[in-house]
């Protein structure tokens, strides 16, 4: 057999464009936090600075309240991360798949 080349494992997401920017992270179990992304690895372990956790309603665990708590520097385990999004939101673009009709 020929020598097998070792493939470098690549992350499914390229988070390098979010370094030093505020992101929001949702975790398994319903917790949410936002902070400045300082680092990450291919397993999506994240390092967030200035992290704030959004508190949940004690009566309804799926509902967030306006309350927050400061966590500071946090290491987030990649296996518990469900969603990562920029804190500033997203920019809407026109749908490139819709064909424009002449009126």
From Swiss-Prot:
Domain of life: Eukaryota
Post-translational modification N-acetylalanine, affected residues: 2
Any one GO molecular function term: protein heterodimerization activity
Keyword terms of this UniProt record: Acetylation, mRNA processing, mRNA splicing, Nucleus, Ribonucleoprotein, RNA-binding, Spliceosome
InterPro entries recorded: Lsm7 (IPR017132), Lsm7/SmG-like (IPR044641), LSM_dom_sf (IPR010920), Sm (IPR047575), Sm_dom_euk/arc (IPR001163)
SUPFAM superfamilies: Sm-like ribonucleoproteins
UniProt-recorded name of the protein: U6 snRNA-associated Sm-like protein LSm7
Subunit-level organization: Component of the precatalytic spliceosome (spliceosome B complex). Component of the U4/U6-U5 tri-snRNP complex, a building block of the precatalytic spliceosome (spliceosome B complex). The U4/U6-U5 tri-snRNP complex is composed of the U4, U6 and U5 snRNAs and at least PRPF3, PRPF4, PRPF6, PRPF8, PRPF31, SNRNP200, TXNL4A, SNRNP40, SNRPB, SNRPD1, SNRPD2, SNRPD3, SNRPE, SNRPF, SNRPG, DDX23, CD2BP2, PPIH, SNU13, EFTUD2, SART1 and USP39, plus LSM2, LSM3, LSM4, LSM5, LSM6, LSM7 and LSM8.
One cellular component (GO) term of this entry: nucleus
Function: Plays a role in pre-mRNA splicing as component of the U4/U6-U5 tri-snRNP complex that is involved in spliceosome assembly, and as component of the precatalytic spliceosome (spliceosome B complex). The heptameric LSM2-8 complex binds specifically to the 3'-terminal U-tract of U6 snRNA.
Pfam name, any one: LSM
Intracellular or extracellular location(s): Nucleus
């Amino acid at each position: 057999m020929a020598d097998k080349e070792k493939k470098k494992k690549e992350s499914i997401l390229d988070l390098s464009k979010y370094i030093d920017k505020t992101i929001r992270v949702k975790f398994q179990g319903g917790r949410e936090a936002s902070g400045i992304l300082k680092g990450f690895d291919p397993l999506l372990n994240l390092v967030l600075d200035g992290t704030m956790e959004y508190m949940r309603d004690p009566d309804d665990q799926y509902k967030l309240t306006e309350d927050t708590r400061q966590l500071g520097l946090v290491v987030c385990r990649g296996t518990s991360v469900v969603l990562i999004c920029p804190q500033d939101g997203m920019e809407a673009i026109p749908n490139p798949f819709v064909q424009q009709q002449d009126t």
